Amino acid sequence: MEDLADRLRAAGYDLICASPYRSGLARGAHMLTAAILYRQRYDLAIVDLYSGKAFLWGEALAVLLTALGRPFAFVLRGGNLPDFARRWPKRVRSCLARASVVTAPSGYLLEEMRPYRNDIQLMPNPLNLSAYRFRLRPHPQPRLIWLRAFHEIYNPSLAPKVVGLLARDFPDVHLTMIGPDKGDGSWQRTEQTAVRVGVAGRISRPGGVPKVQIPACLEAGDIFLNTTNVDNTPVSVLEAMATGLCVVSTRVGGVPYLLEDGQDALLVPPDDAEAMALAIRRILTEPGLGERLSRNARAKAERFNWPTVWPQWQALLAEITRGRQP
């Protein structure tokens, strides 16, 4: 959503953004307050809709914006949203019905959420491709990159297990794990796992880095690991593809809708260290595989470039502000 906000500002749109708070309660309260206080200053609202506790705030905003007579678009987020909708179908259906438009960033969410509203529109997560320098990996080295928040659903502890399996045959293997600690104990469990399997010295964890530094961090590696147990269309994977990294990912959620196994990535079962290590071995030893994955990954990422996605957003916003549904 931050990238969209920057693009809208650059195009001359007057924006009010909420919320900068990380705490769920403070964040939700700030969004509701902003919707009321600035109701005379905005023509429409764009609201991210997540599952779990975060759904409550999207639901409350939908009721409030409807009462205020302000049109709004929902942007569906998170790989857990379909499971949440199956548990609370009437609630989700009622919430989505209030929106002028509902968009999904992936074919996965589009397909899974269609039973709850049948006119959901596909609007891919955009990427500023010019920020990512492409480097073809014809002879990839065991320099591994992991980019995600340290949270249980992303299964960061799997990564050091994979490194442990590779270290015997690839003594120079090294893993860089980039991302903030979300405070659920995953950071500590990952560290403990690395120590237990004897690879703590092969893993760097710089923590979270500013977004502008991510392209340079990705360029330093050759193989990207996506270890998640739940996913939609991860921007981190798109960023890795844009730089030409060879992607190895778990086959979960919306990932198979984004990646084609054997063409632009290698897909493995979730929480399977041996399968992920085997996929990495293939990339390191199988002639031509790394180059094919690298080249095709960049080509796939180009479909998500801002110049491709931006006209779709412009058309959508114009339709909403004209007061009719596309």
Predicted region positions:
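Conserved donor-binding/catalytic core segment of Leloir-type glycosyltransferases
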Residues: L136-A167, L175-D181
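Glycosyltransferase donor-sugar binding loop
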Residues: H174-R189, G207
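Nucleotide-activated donor-binding/catalytic signature segment of Leloir-type glycosyltransferases, i.e.
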Residues: Q188-V209
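Conserved acidic donor-binding segment of nucleotide-sugar-dependent glycosyltransferases
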Residues: D261-G262, L266-A273, R282-P287
